[in-house]
């Protein structure tokens, strides 16, 4: 697996790939990779001749500096997982590489805003769409893969593509869940054992309610 940290190193390889007529599948991540991320890589491998994964903890999508600073970082393990799964290329830039003129974000998408996650994390999706826009302009993938776990994010990025990147196809992939039914997330490691026990109970209650509703006629 090739690893590049600078756009200037990445660009000649992208030119070579595209000159060969190969399709590019892109999976954008912030690292601390889990089976959910790897499922996106596998899906990209099924439908593309070349797969790129990026790892970049984007500071402009965090509302809290402590949250940014404490975000899990497991780069050695991440590289090993990507090599084992057969990812072709890892783009691993530093903040200065992506934001050479300083941190900046802009509002690109207006739909699906002021509700759900965006209501409680103002500016978060401006940071997300700004960095995704930068990566799409840099890499110009054929397809890019996102998990359904981040439903609002997927919808907003689909709108971003309609506005700025008409040739990129956004592929929405099913969430991968743990044995308790919780969607895998890099932040799950922050939960305490007591919090996980509460989720286990709530998850079972939701499953029971769903099964009961399915069995009830007229619901």
Language-model segments: what does each one mean?
Residues 1-210:
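Nucleotidyltransferase catalytic core that binds NTPs
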Residues 208-219:
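Single conserved hydrophobic/aromatic residue that forms the stacking wall/gate
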